[in-house]
């Protein structure tokens, strides 16, 4: 977890700008007993050179925005340390002989931060959001999709307009949001609350200041080491 600009707070992860980190350094005269009780070894404070411009992963943002949202949201596939495409929310996939269709088998038992289930319909709802609003970053990322169809609760097929060898690369950037949150919260709400499947949940956000996240206790993979 991470502390804010006035000290160390347990069970939270904070992304702060450099100015606030310097302020925190000056204010470290917290009582030793309190610091010990709050298990500071499990806290992480990260100083960034700029503030995140948006916390909705479908909205264009700066590099800091991507770094922050990556802790809260996940994609069907991702890159490993050697830049190979590997499974994430999807546990396996296959491509048709003509290169136009990709079928994904999804991991089961995953829930979004708002308690909603992750499934094929959730992926489709994210695509539909993108194609209905060209101002969103996800629109560009999914522009080549002709259709996305749920073959079952945990399997879907995405069909492209033409074979595209960058499709999976782009898919690593398509972060999946809870459809209920998309509908009920919109961009303004997603700037204040997170609704992804990632290891951290948005706890507090101060524009131009800091972002606090807490560990997702219901995370579907091995839990994060930092609170």
Annotated model-derived regions:
Residues 2-11:
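Bacterial lipoprotein signal-peptidase II cleavage site
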Residues 20-45:
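N-terminal low-complexity, Pro/Thr/Ser-rich intrinsically disordered segments
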Residues 41-50, 91, 101-104, 123-126, ...:
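Short, well-ordered beta-strand elements
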Residues 47-97, 128, 195-196:
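N-terminal lobe/hinge region of extracytoplasmic solute-binding protein
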Residues 52-59, 83-86, 113, 166-169, ...:
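Short, solvent-exposed loop/turn elements at domain surfaces
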Residues 80, 171-226:
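Gly/Pro-rich hinge or "lid" segments in bacterial periplasmic/extracellular proteins
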Residues 91-135, 157:
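Aromatic- and charge-enriched surface segment that lines or borders ligand/interaction sites
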Residues 140-182, 204-206:
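Surface-exposed binding/hinge segments that line
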């Amino acid at each position: 977890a991470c502390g804010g600009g006035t000290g160390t707070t347990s069970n939270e992860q904070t992304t702060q700008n450099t100015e606030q980190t310097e302020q925190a350094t000056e204010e470290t005269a917290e009582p030793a007993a309190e610091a010990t009780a709050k298990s500071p070894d499990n806290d992480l404070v990260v100083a960034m050179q700029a503030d995140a411009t948006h916390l909705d992963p479908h909205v264009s943002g700066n590099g800091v925005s991507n770094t922050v949202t990556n802790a809260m949201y996940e994609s069907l596939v991702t890159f490993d340390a050697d830049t190979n495409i590997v499974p994430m929310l999807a546990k396996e996939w296959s491509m048709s002989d003509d290169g136009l269709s990709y079928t994904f088998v999804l991991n089961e038992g995953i829930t979004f931060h708002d308690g909603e289930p992750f499934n094929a319909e959730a992926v489709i709802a994210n695509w539909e959001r993108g194609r209905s609003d060209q101002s969103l970053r996800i629109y560009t990322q999914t522009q080549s999709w002709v259709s996305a169809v749920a073959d079952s609760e945990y399997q879907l097929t995405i069909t492209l307009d033409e074979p595209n060898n960058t499709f999976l690369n782009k898919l690593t950037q398509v972060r999946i949001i809870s459809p209920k949150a998309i509908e009920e919260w919109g961009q303004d709400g997603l700037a204040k609350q997170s609704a992804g499947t990632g290891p951290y949940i948005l706890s507090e956000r101060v524009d131009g200041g800091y972002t606090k996240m807490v560990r997702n206790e219901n995370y579907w993979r091995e839990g994060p080491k930092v609170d």
